[in-house]
């Protein structure tokens, strides 16, 4: 016979961004708790609102499964003394298992007998295990926690109720400073306290109190209501996934409505209006069928449709205040002079250990000069790049960006266009922030891409130089994201820029404001980002590519993919082993690897030397790999017929030189001795 378990924790309003991860964590930890306690179940469903986290287990076994475990103890010769009595070692072993020496038996393993005991544990009724759910709740982790009411413990928010039900059976458990009961709280304004009748009646009991406990149902309600408004008014409403997830975690009983604002505000750049609505007010944007922004918005209230007109007016009033600010800053910022703002950046600190933003821009400008040549920019692109690098942070001192920091770069583009700069310069100023997340949008223009790379590289090198290096998960200056951005842009544009050579060039630059330090750490940091970009590629293949001599990001990623693609083929293992053997022996070569044909003693070493001399890796990575693997029979024949470590030192070094030249060329693809073929 199975049962159903409900656990609900009622709290003060949770931050929206915490709700979904906490709900997921609760479900995962409950599943682990049940598994650990040998309780089978059919399904786990989680619930959440801003004021509660809950989990329900259905089809829960009414008792633990019985447990039978065998334990191996000391050898018989240690367990028995000369008189055949059990020694202290044997007695201590069984005592530790809660058994006696009478439970001992001997079993033979590989010709020697050992003490064994079998421990049987009869499963307890589920009612005896349920109190342990309190430990599940205590184990939840949160990004921030707090104290309240003079208590010593911490939790995400003060706890008000705890409900634990096994079908209809109530458990009055203690959690923090709360006594458990079947009482739960309804909607803060529309509902009241209610008793949950059973684990299976949970949603309906709360629904009567204007609480929709299932977030999936709340989400669908919001989407359906928005689509109904769309159909009624003939408009298009952008349902942004992140905004939808945030909004559903702000309400317990959602009701969507449409508000409006004066059309005069549409003269302000669209990005300002959208930011005001989405980022600051959590409103959905409304457009006409052609995609043109309309003077309307969609909001979702935490309640029903009663007095909705008053709610709409209140939301409109709040939004207008934001739009007034935007209109004011848009008008006033156009009076500013870009060169004046750039000069003022001398007084804006980039970081107290690094210097000003203006100094950061100057270093970035010098880096763009190097990159422009390596990326093959045209003369016009190079001119645009130089201009963009000279002014690209100016908008940080505009009123608009001061009020809406999400618009940095975006407003820079608009203000530079108004000032008569070229579209390429303006676009680069916007694009230099890209990507803003791990999978974020990348720059489209070459000028923007180079500026983005240069800006990020100076940021990375500057922070590393003053010892502000990320450790563990701690990365307060988002240097991992910046490095990932550099790697992604290089890969996307397919620029054959060797990162090791580029970093060497950057460390050779001279600045008045800063000297780059910690180059080795920077290189390791960049390699770690390339490693991450290789995704699920086997670790040994990653290590082989990263250990190679080619640090062109696009080439490295392509090489890893090529190796993975053929790793299951029959020829992969012997081909890699041949090259790997060559790599291992080549390490013994001394000095400059020159080959003297006069020292050849057989046709096989001559054949390998000629094959190596004519080897030129070219084309896509898959083709280069075929070229290398094609050498496998030649390498094998060389090893079968040639004693590499010959007694004659000159002959030995000559043979090692052949292998050294081979591996030097192969290492441009990967270090094959890092690949595991076992």
Curated annotation (Swiss-Prot):
Keyword annotations: Aminoacyl-tRNA synthetase, ATP-binding, Cytoplasm, Ligase, Nucleotide-binding, Protein biosynthesis
EC supergroup of this enzyme: ligase
Cell location: Cytoplasm
Gene: glyS
Protein's name in the database: Glycine--tRNA ligase beta subunit
Catalytic activity: tRNA(Gly) + glycine + ATP = glycyl-tRNA(Gly) + AMP + diphosphate
An annotated GO BP: arginyl-tRNA aminoacylation
PANTHER family per UniProt: GLYCINE--TRNA LIGASE, CHLOROPLASTIC_MITOCHONDRIAL 2, GLYCYL-TRNA SYNTHETASE
């Amino acid at each position: 016979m199975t049962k159903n378990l409900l656990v609900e924790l009622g709290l003060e309003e949770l931050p929206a961004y915490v709700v979904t991860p906490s709900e997921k964590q609760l479900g995962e930890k409950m599943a682990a708790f049940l598994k650990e306690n040998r309780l089978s179940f059919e399904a786990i469903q989680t619930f959440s609102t801003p004021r509660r986290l809950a989990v329900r287990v259905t089809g829960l076994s009414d008792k633990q499964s019985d447990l039978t475990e065998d334990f191996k103890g000391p050898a018989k010769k240690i367990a028995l003394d000369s008189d055949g009595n059990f020694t202290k070692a044997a007695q201590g072993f069984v005592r530790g298992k809660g058994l006696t020496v009478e439970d001992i038996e001997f079993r033979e393993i590989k010709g020697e007998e050992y003490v064994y005991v079998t421990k049987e544990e009869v499963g307890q009724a589920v009612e005896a295990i349920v109190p342990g759910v309190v430990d599940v709740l205590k184990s939840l982790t949160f990004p921030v926690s707090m104290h309240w009411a003079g208590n010593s413990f911490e939790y995400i928010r003060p706890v008000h109720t705890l409900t634990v039900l096994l079908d209809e059976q109530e458990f009055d458990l203690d959690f923090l400073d709360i006594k458990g009961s079947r009482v739960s709280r309804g909607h803060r304004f529309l509902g009241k306290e209610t008793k949950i009748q059973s684990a299976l009646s949970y949603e309906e009991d709360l629904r009567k109190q204007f609480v929709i406990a299932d977030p999936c149902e709340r989400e669908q309600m919001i989407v359906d209501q928005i689509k109904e408004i769309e159909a009624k008014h003939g408009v298009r409403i952008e349902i942004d996934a992140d905004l939808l997830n945030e909004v559903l975690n702000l309400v317990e009983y959602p009701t969507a409505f449409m508000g409006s604002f004066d059309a005069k505000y549409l003269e302000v750049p669209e990005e300002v209006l959208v930011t005001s609505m989405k980022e600051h007010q959590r409103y959905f944007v409304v457009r006409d069928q052609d995609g043109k922004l309309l003077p309307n918005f969609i909001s979702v209230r935490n309640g029903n449709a009663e007095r909705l007109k008053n709610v709409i007016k209140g939301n409109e009033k709040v939004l207008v205040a934001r739009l007034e600010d935007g209109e004011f800053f848009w008008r006033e910022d156009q009076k500013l002079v870009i060169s004046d703002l750039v000069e003022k950046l001398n007084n804006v600190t980039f970081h107290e250990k690094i210097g000003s933003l203006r100094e950061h821009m100057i270093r970035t400008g010098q880096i763009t000069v190097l990159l422009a040549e390596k990326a093959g920019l045209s003369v016009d692109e190079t001119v645009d790049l130089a201009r963009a690098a000279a002014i690209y942070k100016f908008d940080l001192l505009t009123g608009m960006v001061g009020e809406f920091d999400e618009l940095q770069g975006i407003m820079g583009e608009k203000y530079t266009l108004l000032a008569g700069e070229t579209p390429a310069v303006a676009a680069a100023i916007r694009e230099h922030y890209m990507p803003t997340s791990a999978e974020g949008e990348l720059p489209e223009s070459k000028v923007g891409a180079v500026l983005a790379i240069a800006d990020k590289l100076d940021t990375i090198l500057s922070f590393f130089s003053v010892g502000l290096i990320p450790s563990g998960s701690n990365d307060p200056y988002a240097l991992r994201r910046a490095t990932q951005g550099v790697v992604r842009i290089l890969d996307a544009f397919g620029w054959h820029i060797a990162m090791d050579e580029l970093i060497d060039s950057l460390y050779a630059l001279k600045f008045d404001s800063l000297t780059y330090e910690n180059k080795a750490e920077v290189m390791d940091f960049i390699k770690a980002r390339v490693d991450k970009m290789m995704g699920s590629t086997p670790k040994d293949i990653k290590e082989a590519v990263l250990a190679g001599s080619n640090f062109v990001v696009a080439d490295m990623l392509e090489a890893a993919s090529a190796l993975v693609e053929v790793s299951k083929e029959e020829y992969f293992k012997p081909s890699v082993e041949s090259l790997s053997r060559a790599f291992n022996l080549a390490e013994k070569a001394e000095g400059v690897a020159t080959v003297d044909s006069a020292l050849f003693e057989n046709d096989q070493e001559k054949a390998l030397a000629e094959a190596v001399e004519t080897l030129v890796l070219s084309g896509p990575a898959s083709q280069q790999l075929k070229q290398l693997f094609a050498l496998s029979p030649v390498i094998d024949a060389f090893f079968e017929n040639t004693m590499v470590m010959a007694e004659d030192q000159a002959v030995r070094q000559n043979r090692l030189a052949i292998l050294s030249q081979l591996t030097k060329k192969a290492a441009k693809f990967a270090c094959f001795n890092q690949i595991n073929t076992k």
